[in-house]
Amino acid sequence: MHIKKGDNVKVIAGKDKGKEGKVVSTEPKKDRVVVEGVNIIKKHQKPTQFNPEGGILETEAAIHVSNVQLLDPKTNEPTRVGHKFVDGKKVRIAKKSGEEIKSNN
């Protein structure tokens, strides 16, 4: 998967199209990512010992990785991701600027 935790992405499809946010978590087996402030759902929570009031909680749900695009670190525009070997290590690069994408977990 070309998106990692901590990456800044832009939603390119779906109800939250155009929104930008940071990737909170990834689910590689399902090809899904959770983006901060995107795809907010309401979850009905029963009262429990830890949360005696219960109620309706708002939380972020996962969206498919094909609906987000990585933001170029140089220009802050959506870009595709490429891979290149530098000093024997495989690194991600932004296709638009050629800039190396650093992981900021």
Swiss-Prot record:
GO terms, biological process: translation
Q: Which family does it belong to?
A: Belongs to the universal ribosomal protein uL24 family.
Protein name per UniProt: Large ribosomal subunit protein uL24
By which gene is this protein encoded? rplX
Describe the protein's quaternary organization and the partners it interacts with: Part of the 50S ribosomal subunit.
Sequence segments annotated as region (Disordered): 1-25
Q: Which GO terms describe its cellular component?
A: ribonucleoprotein complex; ribosome
Superkingdom of this protein's organism:
Bacteria
- Spell out the molecular function terms from Gene Ontology: rRNA binding; structural constituent of ribosome
Q: Which Pfam families match?
A: KOW (PF00467), ribosomal_L24 (PF17136)
* Bilayer-crossing regions: none
Listed SMART domains: KOW
Query: What job does the chain carry out?
Result: One of two assembly initiator proteins, it binds directly to the 5'-end of the 23S rRNA, where it nucleates assembly of the 50S subunit. One of the proteins that surrounds the polypeptide exit tunnel on the outside of the subunit.
* Source organism: Staphylococcus saprophyticus subsp. saprophyticus (strain ATCC 15305 / DSM 20229 / NCIMB 8711 / NCTC 7292 / S-41)
> What SUPFAM superfamilies does the record tag this protein with?
Translation proteins SH3-like domain (SSF50104)
Keywords for this protein: Ribonucleoprotein, Ribosomal protein, RNA-binding, rRNA-binding
Cysteine-cysteine disulfides? none
